[in-house]
């Protein structure tokens, strides 16, 4: 379950790197995953979440 957000399920996406001469090579875009200790139902737990979910959590508190 590496490189996947435990809250929203956001995972890697695939695309191309495009050079100036328009050659294309496959590339994987990983989400920005951070390990954060948060409290869920009164229990402190370490979860891997993306930064957009982390931002939403901080705004809701």
Curated annotation (Swiss-Prot):
<dbReference type="InterPro" id="IPR034704">
    <property type="entry name" value="Ribosomal_bL28/bL31-like_sf"/>
</dbReference>
<dbReference type="GO" id="GO:0005840">
    <property type="term" value="C:ribosome"/>
</dbReference>
<dbReference type="Pfam" id="PF00830">
    <property type="entry name" value="Ribosomal_L28"/>
</dbReference>
<dbReference type="InterPro" id="IPR037147">
    <property type="entry name" value="Ribosomal_bL28_sf"/>
</dbReference>
<keyword id="KW-0689">Ribosomal protein</keyword>
<dbReference type="GO" id="GO:0003735">
    <property type="term" value="F:structural constituent of ribosome"/>
</dbReference>
<dbReference type="GO" id="GO:0006412">
    <property type="term" value="P:translation"/>
</dbReference>
<dbReference type="InterPro" id="IPR001383">
    <property type="entry name" value="Ribosomal_bL28_bact-type"/>
</dbReference>
<protein>
    <recommendedName>
        <fullName>Large ribosomal subunit protein bL28</fullName>
    </recommendedName>
</protein>
<keyword id="KW-0687">Ribonucleoprotein</keyword>
<dbReference type="GO" id="GO:1990904">
    <property type="term" value="C:ribonucleoprotein complex"/>
</dbReference>
<dbReference type="InterPro" id="IPR050096">
    <property type="entry name" value="Bacterial_rp_bL28"/>
</dbReference>
<comment type="similarity">
    <text>Belongs to the bacterial ribosomal protein bL28 family.</text>
</comment>
<dbReference type="InterPro" id="IPR026569">
    <property type="entry name" value="Ribosomal_bL28"/>
</dbReference>
